[in-house]
UniProtKB/Swiss-Prot annotation:
One of its GO terms (biological process) is transcription antitermination. Nitrate- and nitrite-responsive positive regulator for nasFEDCBA operon expression. NasR protein binds to the factor-independent terminator site located in the nasF operon leader RNA to effect transcription antitermination. This is Nitrate regulatory protein. Residues 37-284 form the NIT domain. The gene is nasR.
Length: 396
């Protein structure tokens, strides 16, 4: 009964086709990993050019002229590699991926006009930073679309880890640009300060996602080398809580150099993530070489069912994990709302008892949090706890 069909030519053809398609999909997987690596390298070069252009504009054309030229040359060199990596992905790309690539490719030629305006100092530093950031954003948007076509959990996890890390690194790059702008001017407006705070706060969720999915060697290197240095933390405190000194750009260069060193360390981890992704894809490709075009000799319905069960079990576990994550996210959202309420109450206390404006109260809470190396909600909670002990009459 089990051998009724036998190894007929039709059966052999179907197994051979399955092997060929599997190998083709693995080749596409390797190509997607290569494309992600080229995007990462191009984004890093653009971040370098954005930073140099920002200092050039903020210094009134006194500093970083050579760095601007070098940055542009490195970007152009990497662009050639990026376009070459696009070609193998063209035939197998989904419509959604094609849209993302089209948007990025549409913005890239605008670099020439942007560079001319920077070189001639016909553009404000904020606008130049925004245009560089827009180009980078469209390049980064390609990466998650690559992940949608990956059905191997190991490769998918590595791709998400890489994308999360790239997002966090880009926020660190924007932090460098915004901080350099404020320090060079000797003044942080409320809007610029809020933008800086948003970039600082936005990095942690990205790096948390990276650490949850990356391999131990990469997370260990990140923890060892990529945290914000003491100098960065001190300058962050100045930028977020008071106006910087007017020192003809000296503090701006200190900030820029410290942030650049951190970005280069982040790039080192990013390169490890890419190597690990490509190695994992190559290992799958080598491990799936067909040993024969025929099915195994003991192939039968029971063994097929067993293999299907083994394939379904990880999916079930993955769904359970996703549900657990969703529950955790909902709980985190609830906690975040409660924390926000505590901070608002603490602001009200400062406004009532110290006669502060809302912005002043917020800045005071943030400064206390930075000085004590604590979260703002912890300061707010402590303030509300001791409120009952105050014997100060509220100011009119």
């Amino acid at each position: 009964m089990n051998n009724m069909a036998g190894n007929t030519p039709e059966v052999v053809d179907w197994f051979a086709r399955a092997r060929r398609l599997q190998k083709q999909q693995l080749h596409q997987l390797a190509q997607q990993g290569t494309l992600a690596g080229q995007i990462s390298a191009l984004v890093h070069m653009l971040q370098c050019e954005r930073g140099a252009s920002n200092i050039w504009l903020c210094s009134g054309g006194r500093l970083y002229a050579a760095e601007c030229r070098a940055g542009a040359a490195l970007v152009d060199e990497q662009l050639t590699r990026f376009y070459a990596a696009l070609e193998p992905a063209r035939d197998a790309a989904s419509s959604a991926l094609c849209w993302r690539i089209a948007c990025a490719v549409w913005y890239l030629p605008q670099l020439a006009a942007l560079r001319k305006r920077v070189r001639d100092r016909e553009i404000a530093a904020e606008e130049a930073t925004g245009q560089f950031s827009r180009i980078i954003r469209h390049l980064l948007n390609i990466v998650p679309q690559l992940n949608d076509s990956i059905d191997d959990p190991q490769i998918a996890g590595r791709m998400v880890a890489l994308y999360s890390f790239m997002q966090g690194k880009e926020l660190a790059g924007q932090e460098r640009a915004l901080g350099a702008l404020g320090f060079a001017r000797g003044q942080f407006s409320d809007e610029l300060r809020q933008q800086l705070v948003d970039r600082i706060d936005g990095q942690q969720p990205c790096f948390d996602s990276f650490q949850a999915l990356a391999q131990p060697p990469q997370t260990a290197l990140f923890a060892e080398q990529c945290q914000a240095s003491l100098e960065i933390e001190q300058l962050r405190r100045v930028a977020c809580t008071r106006q910087p000194p007017a020192d003809e750009g000296e503090t701006a260069l200190r900030w820029f150099c410290a942030q650049t060193q951190r970005l280069e360390q982040l790039r080192g981890v990013e390169e490890l993530l890419i190597v690990d992704l490509l190695n994992a894809a190559d290992a799958l490709l080598e491990g799936e070489e067909p040993e024969a075009q025929l099915p195994p000799a003991d192939w039968q319905e029971d063994s097929i069912a067993l293999r299907l069960d083994k394939q379904l079990l990880p999916l079930v576990r993955q769904q359970a994990h996703e549900l657990q994550q969703l529950s955790g996210q909902l709980a985190s959202l609830k906690d975040a709302l409660e924390e926000r309420k505590l901070i608002e109450k603490a602001k009200s206390v400062l406004m009532t008892y110290q006669g502060m404006q809302e912005e002043q109260a917020w800045q005071a809470l943030r400064k206390m949090a930075m000085d004590k190396n604590q979260r703002m909600v912890e300061i707010a909670r402590a303030l509300l706890t001791v409120k009952a002990l105050w014997r100060v009459t509220p100011k009119e």
